Amino acid sequence: MVDLNDKVIRGYLLSLVGEDGLQMIEKMPEGEVTDEEIAAKTEVLLNTVRRTLFILNENKFAICRRERDSNSGWLTYLWRLDFSDIEHQLMKEKKKLLRNLKTRLEFEENNVFYMCPQGCVRLLFDEATETEFLCPMCGEDLVFYDNSHFIDVLRKRVDALSSA
């Protein structure tokens, strides 16, 4: 089983399946079990269990096996969790986050912004000229927005992720 006390793993799973899904993962019985058994043992609603299992399955953290009842012909779905690939998934997420942060950093560095003093909007220079430097929401005069602090924060975040 995966270490759910690890902040990174816990945060990643929480972002995937939410609090109820995380509760289900924590209390999930070992081996192959049906979704009804999971709901009964984890005290999580059946809809939530199914939603969580589908999300985990899409991310390759849950494995499903179908079994046909020889008498009734009904299918039974047996589920088990498999977090053996979580490190690889976390690396993919890290690369995606790093790529997005670099894109945002480049955008912030290469553009000039104007902002409404009331906080209504933040516009690019071209957009501000189109509105004649007036806020399209409230009509206030737009003021130059110095985003250097935001750029510094983004740069530190990119550096931290790159070195980790």
Swiss-Prot record:
Transcription factor that plays a role in the activation of archaeal genes transcribed by RNA polymerase. Facilitates transcription initiation by enhancing TATA-box recognition by TATA-box-binding protein (Tbp), and transcription factor B (Tfb) and RNA polymerase recruitment. Not absolutely required for transcription in vitro, but particularly important in cases where Tbp or Tfb function is not optimal. It dynamically alters the nucleic acid-binding properties of RNA polymerases by stabilizing the initiation complex and destabilizing elongation complexes. Keywords: DNA-binding, Transcription, Transcription regulation. The keyword Transcription regulation applies. Pfam families: TFIIE_alpha (PF02002). Monomer. Interaction with RNA polymerase subunits RpoF and RpoE is necessary for Tfe stimulatory transcription activity. Able to interact with Tbp and RNA polymerase in the absence of DNA promoter. Interacts both with the preinitiation and elongation complexes. It comes from Methanosarcina barkeri (strain Fusaro / DSM 804). Residues 5-87 form the HTH TFE/IIEalpha-type domain. The gene is tfe. This is Transcription factor E. Belongs to the TFE family. GO terms for biological process: regulation of DNA-templated transcription; transcription initiation at RNA polymerase II promoter. HAMAP family: TFE_arch. InterPro entries: TF_E_archaea, TFE, TFIIE/TFIIEa_HTH, TFIIE_asu, TFIIEa/SarR/Rpc3_HTH_dom, WH-like_DNA-bd_sf, WH_DNA-bd_sf. It comes from the Archaea. The keyword Nucleotidyltransferase does not apply.
